[in-house]
A protein has these predicted regions:
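C-terminal transmembrane bundle of multi-pass solute transporters/carriers
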Residues: 1-160
Length: 160
């Protein structure tokens, strides 16, 4: 139990650091590049979990902490940057519908994904399923990397 507390405490600290630095990162490398870099960092960091699962004991703890911290940091940077841009670009009278639609599609697949991942991990083993998930996360980055976001300094100004 103490190790779980350590993992989540360090990850929460990294997430807080991401929240506090999102605006500065966006100002330095541009909001579009921030969204892409944060998403890619999170995807690459997710490879730490299948590696830790393959190790299979407490010696994998630093890998789990590092992966969780990188994902916590980058997830907050990503979410703050993209949600702020979405809300600034969306007409005010459509904000509720836009946010509800995003939440429905993003959060709506999570229970289905968790159920399928659990079933696949039971059938094929934890590490292979985590590797497939990490590969999927990296491949999903291609869509956003190929989008007009790349190079945008200010998503709101350039997106209108």
């Amino acid at each position: 139990p103490a190790l779980y507390g350590l993992i989540f405490t360090v990850g929460a600290g990294a997430a807080l650091a991401g929240a506090l630095s999102a605006a500065k990162i966006g100002a330095r490398i541009g909001q579009g590049n921030t969204v892409i870099a944060a998403l890619l960092l999170s995807a690459v960091a997710s490879f730490g979990f299948p590696i830790a699962a393959m190790i299979g004991d407490e010696s994998a703890l630093p890998i789990v902490i590092a992966a969780g911290s990188l994902i916590g940091f980058s997830s907050l940077v990503f979410n703050i940057t993209q949600v702020s841009a979405r809300q600034a670009l969306c007409p005010e009278h459509l904000l509720g519908r836009m946010n509800a639609s995003i939440r429905f599609f993003v959060w709506g697949v999570m229970p289905i994904s968790a159920l399928l991942a659990g079933a696949f991990a039971t059938w094929f083993g934890l590490a292979p399923v985590l590797f497939v998930g990490a590969i999927g996360a990296v491949l999903a980055c291609w869509f956003i990397f190929a989008s007009p976001l790349r190079g945008m300094k200010n998503i709101v100004a350039e997106g209108r």
